[in-house]
Amino acid sequence: MRRRFRSGAAILLLGSVPQLLAQTGAARPGTRVLMDAHNCYPYEGRWNDRIERALSGGVPVAIEQDLYWYTDPITHKSWSVVAHQPPLSGKEPTLTTYFFDRIRPIVEKALRSGDRSKWPIITLNLDVKTEEPEHLRAILQMLKDHEDWITTATRTDDIRTQSPLTIRPVLVLTGQSDAQQQIFYDDLRPGDRVLVFGAVHTFDQDPMAATQVLEPARANNYRRWWNNPWNVVEAGGQMQAGAWTPKDMRRLRMLVDHAHAQGLWIRFYTLDGASTEAMTRNGWFANYNFGSEAAVKDRWRAAYQAGVDYIATDQYEELAAYLHALRSVNRR
């Protein structure tokens, strides 16, 4: 079955000027399906190779980073660290050392090449675990330090008025928190660059509610994507999922089509399928496990066919290879 993606005409500009796109080209919702590397960082002193694994399948790719605000108990100095959960030691990597420094050669190569057809090539998905104003401002400063790499919009007087995206190699997404919107958007001056884009609010008290109940708002200048657990597709989520059915596919398509009609990218998390032993050995979580390779591939294929923008998984290499195979078949 062929994917039902909406095509968008890319605007090609001469020289080194970034592409200015109003939700068109590769950045347009519904244009491409990416592997989203869930929890792509070390923790418990293990799994230090996760970012290498995520990048091994090539670009474009999405990478999730969880951020905490750490305060040294002796010096009382504070900084942002990449971590999974407390307790924190202060020895955790920062977003700069773990993520930005690692992707530097990839981004600089992309900037030199002049081929912007696949930009953004890396989506950074921020899961901000603690929202101290100082933490949010520190995150924003780290993004400003890499501003020449990052896809931006222009802060408008009315948030409902979307400015075109200036496309660069990296796109930064974050959560639906109003506290984050305050720092990342509201406190900016009109005309300033918007460096990170929030998720729309999801009203999922009933996860199987109608799409317009779950997500009633169109994309605005700051909120440009929709993040969902899988239980909005299959009741009960991964651990209660049975065989994949046409009814499930219709539900998935409804959610994806609704998001794209609202001008939103859509992400689903987290689609794994492995043995209990493999899940434990790799630091993956049972509540995301469909239980088998066959079961998760049914969902990966369905997500690809429906045009899900970001498929989050812990099985980076497997999903990247599977998407490559599906694209190859689709091109025939």
Predicted region positions:
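Bacterial N-terminal signal peptides that target proteins for export
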Residues: 1-9
